[in-house]
Regions:
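Acidic (Asp/Glu)-rich catalytic clusters
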Residues: 17-23, 55-56, 103, 125-129
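Short, acidic/polar
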Residues: 39-54, 93-100
Length: 319
C-alpha cells in the first residue's frame, strides 16, 4: 500500500486499474496535485472551493498543502479540510519555525525532516503530544547534504537484479548514476536528525515512513536504515514501516499489522531484520489481500500460479 503525496491526476486512474484487477500494483492512494502558493488561495471561500474538487472529483481523502502561503492561508487549508473531511498533509519547507506552526495549527502530517539537527524537550513534546504524523524523509534530509546520493554511490542500485527487472535500464541508470553531490562523511548530519526522530517516537509521537520517490522500491529500505542510524531499535523501525504508516493514512483498522479482521497483507523475509535492519531487503514472498507473490519476480504463487505480465520495456520490440 502506498500513498503518493504529490502526483498528477492520472494516478487516480492507475489506482482504479489496480483496484479493478486490470493491472498489477500496490493499493494506491494519493493527494493528487499538491496546492502551492501559485494557486493563490487568497480567501477561505476560494480555498474550500479548490478542495471540493479533490473531494468530489478525485474522490481522495488526502490533500497536500505545499507551502500555500502565509499562516492564515495555511489555516484556511486546515479549516476547509476539516469541513470536507480531508486529511491535510504539509511540506516541511526546511523551516523549523514554520513546522512548529504546522503542528500547532492542526495539520495531520508534517513531511520532511526538521532542518535543525538537535531538538530538545519542547519540540519533542510538541510533536509527541499533538499526535501529528511526522514523516522525516531522511534520504533528502533538510539542513545538510542529502544521504540519497551517498546510497546511489555505495549501494549501486543499477547493478541490483531486482531493480533491473522492474525498471527500464536507461531510466534506472539515469536516476542513479550521478555521483556529483559528494561530501565528506563528517558533513552529513542525518544521524543527528535521526536521533531527533527517535526522541519523538520514544516520547509517544507518531513517526511514519516516506522515501520521496527518487528510487522507488528500495528507497523505503534505505529510509529504514537511516532511522536505525540514530538509535531507533529494529522493532520500532518495523513499526514505523507498517502500523505507523497505516495510521498515517487513516487505515489502521484494515492494514498495518497481522490481526483478525484485517486484510491479509504481509511480507516474508529470509533473514531476521530484528538482528540487522538491513535484512529488510531479504524478501521471499509478498502477500496482498491473501494473494501470495514471489518477492523476486512478483509472479503469483498462491492461491493460483501465474507469471506476471512482462512490462512494456521487456517486450521484443523495445529490446
Amino acid at each position: 500500500t502506498i500513498r503518493d503525496p504529490q502526483a498528477i491526476p492520472e494516478i487516480f486512474l492507475y489506482s482504479d486499474l489496480v483496484a479493478a484487477g486490470l493491472t498489477d500494483g500496490p493499493r494506491i492512494y494519493s493527494t493528487g496535485p499538491g496546492l502551492f502558493i501559485i494557486d493563490q488561495l487568497n480567501s477561505y471561500e476560494k480555498t474550500k472551493s479548490r478542495l471540493e474538487i479533490y473531494k468530489n472529483r478525485y474522490k481522495t481523502n488526502y490533500i497536500k498543502s505545499y507551502l500555500v502561503g502565509n499562516r492564515k492561508q495555511r489555516q484556511w487549508m486546515i479549516q476547509a479540510s476539516k469541513e470536507l473531511q480531508l486529511m491535510p498533509v504539509t511540506e516541511g519547507g526546511a523551516d523549523t519555525k514554520q513546522d512548529i506552526t504546522h503542528v500547532l495549527d492542526g495539520f495531520t502530517s508534517n513531511e520532511h525532516s526538521l532542518p535543525n539537527a538537535n531538538i530538545y524537550k519542547d519540540v519533542v513534546q510538541l510533536f509527541a503530544q499533538s499526535n501529528i504524523q511526522y514523516t522525516p524523509t531522511l534520504l533528502v534530509s533538510f539542513g545538510g547534504p542529502l544521504p540519497l546520493f551517498q546510497f546511489f554511490a555505495k549501494e549501486n542500485p543499477f547493478s541490483n537484479s531486482k531493480l533491473r527487472r522492474f525498471f527500464p535500464k536507461d531510466l534506472l541508470y539515469n536516476n542513479t548514476a550521478t555521483r556529483l553531490l559528494y561530501f565528506r562523511e563528517e558533513d552529513y548530519h542525518v544521524k543527528d536528525l535521526s536521533k531527533g526522530v527517535n526522541k519523538i517516537m520514544a516520547a509517544g509521537g507518531n513517526i511514519a515512513l516516506g522515501g520521496h520517490g527518487d528510487m522507488q522500491g528500495i528507497q523505503n529500505h534505505w529510509e529504514m536504515w537511516l532511522l536505525a542510524s540514530g538509535g531507533m531499535s529494529p522493532h520500532n523501525v518495523l513499526k514505523v514501516a507498517t502500523i505507523n504508516g497505516a495510521k498515517a493514512l487513516g487505515l489502521a483498522a484494515d492494514l498495518g499489522s497481522i490481526e483478525k479482521g484485517k486484510l491479509a497483507d504481509l511480507i516474508i523475509l529470509d533473514k531476521n531484520p530484528l538482528v540487522d535492519i538491513k535484512n529488510s531487503t531479504s524478501i521471499i514472498y509478498v502477500m496482498k489481500n491473501g494473494v501470495l507473490y514471489s518477492g523476486e519476480t512478483l509472479d503469483k504463487v498462491y492461491p493460483v500460479k501465474e507469471a506476471i505480465k512482462k512490462p512494456w520495456w521487456q517486450m521484443e520490440k523495445h529490446n
